[in-house]
Amino acid sequence: MVKKTLGRRKVEIVKMTKESNLQVTFSKRKAGLFKKASEFCTLCDAKIAMIVFSPAGKVFSFGHPNVDVLLDHFRGCVVGHNNTNLDESYTKLHVQMLNKSYTEVKAEVEKEQKNKQSRAQNERENENAEEWWSKSPLELNLSQSTCMIRVLKDLKKIVDEKAIQLIHQTNPNFYVGSSSNAAAPATVSGGNISTNQGFFDQNGMTTNPTQTLLFGFDIMNRTPGV
Amino acid sequence: MRSKIKLSLIANKTSRRTTFRKRKGGITNKLHELTTLCGVKACAVISSPYENPVVWPSTEGVQEAVSMFMERPATEQSKLMMSHETYLQDKITKETKKLESLRRENRESQLRQFMFDCVEGKMSEHQYGARDLQDLSLYIDHYINQLNSSVMLLTNNGASSSSFPPPLHTSVAGAGAGAGAAPLVVAGAGAAPLAVAGAGASPLAVAGVGAAPLAVAGAGPPMAQNQYEPIQPYIPTAFSDNIQYQAPVDFNHQIQHGIYDNLSLDPNHQYPFQDDPFMEMLMEYPYEQVGYAAEHAHIPFMNGNYYNYHQPPTVGLTTTGHMPSNNATTTTTTNTTVV
């Protein structure tokens, strides 16, 4: 298997000659530096201010709690804030919350990436056993495509019918398109079915707003259509 | 393997001080590398409860960088200025977008798998709710659109509907049974199977898929070039004095009234269509139900047609009022060739 990257190598710390490489290196290293600074502030309760000029002449700055306070402090200016401590404690609390959110989102991303990798691996393993209909639509010939369209149209009828049946089972009082319903039932919101006993996660594909909605619901006022 | 550090204040003071000292060195080192490699100016001020503020590269260096910074217009200063909060918010936004994208990809992959499992008759292997079925319905629409685009592309490029290689020999079914006894099946140009009606049988128009349309045995006008579905005759099911023809199946009616009479949320509950492959169910009545293309698509579980041409069932037509009689005295076996 061919390596995708060059891996970790010892980089000679001298000015780079190639302009494009230099710009890319700057962007990546700047991002890494700011990340380190962010972690540093969170873990050690330190205050930091950084100013970095780019090769293109732009100026980037990072500061905790912000750049101005520390620059003023360094230049010997006295900033007249009566409630500095209050601001600081609020900032700390907010940063703490943001860090928590960031950690959660990051964990979710990793989980989804693992799912994606395992799916890709399964697909690679089953590649040889794959039937023609599992291929990409562009790989099918005319007769196969025509056949597949026919089959999928019939499958769609079955799926739609079954979805309606499931809704009736989970909410027997819900009558499709009935004007007697004063408000949308809890199981349905604007034509998007939220009842899910399935193995798919709730954060699935969102319904296309241009799609014709099932079950007589108006997406704007969320009341059953007559 | 490295353990992940929880992003929160280190509770132990000694550990916190050690971490501060090490990480401070790391940051100054990274700054040095960045400025050297890219030939840019940078400065940093680090202060903490443990020691005096640290400046990098030096007090003069910081003052120079700060004065350069202050010379810039206020808009330019604030444009790329980040506080810790704005930095984290920015990171959260980026990660959230990434997460949405990954979820969409994974969901589509799930739905694709679910769709093909339904097609192959493995629907009972899944647990699903109404939301899943609605998403699947939308995905099927999306997939059909892709297929339609593909068909348009292939049609415009003049592609043949059948990609199977031409058969090695011409197969003639029931040639010795007398004229009109059985239809002759001849593989036509472009590997499009052509059913040619035997002499004396009722005329039948058949067009080869992808081939030039042929009018056989005095049939009506030839079909349009892009019309892929020839007229399919009903095949007799019982051969007696009164030939009975199989009635066409109202598939939609069957769906609405037959299949869903005993629906259950229980995932183990078996529905009539769950164990048999979906396509097999579609192919139950291939002549009435499915067009020409589906017959030749060579789906193993659809119709058991493992050959490169379509062979309708060979029917021994007995003497009836509906069909021309086999008169032994006038029977001549003809070898039909299609040019």
Swiss-Prot record, chain A:
Pfam families: SRF-TF
InterPro entries given in the database record: TF_MADSbox (IPR002100), TF_MADSbox_sf (IPR036879)
PROSITE patterns to which the protein is assigned, alphabetical: MADS_BOX_2 (PS50066)
Cellular compartment(s): Nucleus
Gene Ontology CC entries for this record: nucleus
Keywords: Coiled coil, DNA-binding, Nucleus, Transcription, Transcription regulation
Deleted gene: phenotype: Embryonic lethality when homozygous.
All residue ranges annotated as the MADS-box domain in the record: 6-66
Record's compositionally biased regions (Basic and acidic residues): 108-127
Residues forming coiled coils: 95-132
Biological process according to GO: chloroplast organization; embryo sac development
GO molecular function: DNA binding; DNA-binding transcription factor activity; protein dimerization activity
Residues covered by region (Disordered): 108-131
Function statement: Probable transcription factor that controls female gametophyte (megagametogenesis) development and chloroplast biogenesis during embryo development.
PANTHER family documented for this protein: AGAMOUS-LIKE 50-RELATED, MADS BOX PROTEIN
Name by which UniProt lists this protein: Agamous-like MADS-box protein AGL23
Gene field: AGL23
From Swiss-Prot, chain B:
Ranges in coiled-coil conformation: 86-112
Example of a GO cellular component annotation carried by this entry: nucleus
Residue spans crossing the bilayer: none
Key word Cell membrane present: no
Cellular compartments annotated: Nucleus
Gene Ontology BP annotations: positive regulation of transcription by RNA polymerase II
Keywords: Coiled coil, DNA-binding, Nucleus, Transcription, Transcription regulation
One function term, GO molecular function aspect: DNA-binding transcription factor activity, RNA polymerase II-specific
Pfam families from the UniProt entry: SRF-TF
Cross-referenced InterPro entries: MADS-box/MEF2_TF, SRF-like_MADS-box, TF_MADSbox, TF_MADSbox_sf
Intrachain disulfide bonds: none
SMART domains (alphabetical): MADS (SM00432)
MADS-box domain segment(s): 1-60
Protein role: Probable transcription factor.
Subunit record text: Interacts with AGL61/DIANA and AGL62.
The protein's name in its UniProt record: Agamous-like MADS-box protein AGL86
Species per Swiss-Prot/TrEMBL record: Arabidopsis thaliana (Mouse-ear cress)
Lineage: Eukaryota, Viridiplantae, Streptophyta, Embryophyta, Tracheophyta
